[in-house]
A protein has these predicted regions:
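Bacterial N-terminal signal peptides that target proteins for export
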Residues: 2-11
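Sec/Tat signal peptide C-region and signal peptidase I cleavage site
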Residues: 21-25
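Generic alpha-helical secondary structure signal
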Residues: 47-51, 100
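Short, non-transmembrane amphipathic alpha-helical segments
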Residues: 92-122
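Polar/charged, Gly/Pro-rich intrinsically disordered segments
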Residues: 26-42, 50-93, 119-151
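Bacterial N-terminal signal peptides
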Residues: 10-18
């Protein structure tokens, strides 16, 4: 009986470590956080500088965050808006229960990028994420303050 208990604990430990590694290895949005983007964000948030941030990011869209999830467009006005197109299969992967829905995707994939981009910004905009299906119909939205998301 102790052998089975030990094997079970070992299996749980391996699964936990592999899931952690997968989360860290799959932070592809951070590839968009270039020195030119950091420089543009560090400037005062005038309309012109916000457009520059938009252009720097939108020239690289559509950008695959992971299989089935693509960053389609970024808009930076009063808030930092990200439009992500997601396949049903990928949405189902993240929607393990009804209450959390796609918050896990936003927490794992969007927050690290958002926090690193605006870490040195003089003004930190709120984050708005709109996840749309393949036809462009919104099925999940998230709105968060920098101070609540990035610590």
């Amino acid at each position: 009986m102790n052998v089975f208990k030990t094997l079970k604990l070992f299996a749980v430990a391996i699964i936990s470590v592999s899931m952690s590694c997968a989360v860290l290895a799959n932070s592809s949005l951070n590839n968009l956080n270039t020195n030119s983007l950091k420089s543009a964000v560090a400037l005062s948030p005038t309309a012109e500088n916000k457009r520059k941030v938009e252009r720097l990011l939108n020239t690289k869209t559509p950008y695959q965050i992971e299989t089935g999830a693509v960053l389609k467009k970024v808009k930076y006005s009063k808030h930092f808006n990200m439009n992500v197109q997601m396949s049903s299969k990928t949405a189902d992967k993240y929607s393990s229960d009804e209450t959390d829905s796609l918050n896990r995707f936003v927490n794992e994939k969007i927050h690290p990028f958002y926090c690193s981009v605006f870490a040195n910004a003089p003004v930190k905009p709120d984050l708005y994420v709109d996840i749309v299906d393949n036809q462009g119909k919104s099925f999940f939205g998230s709105a968060e303050r920098y101070s609540d998301t990035c610590q």
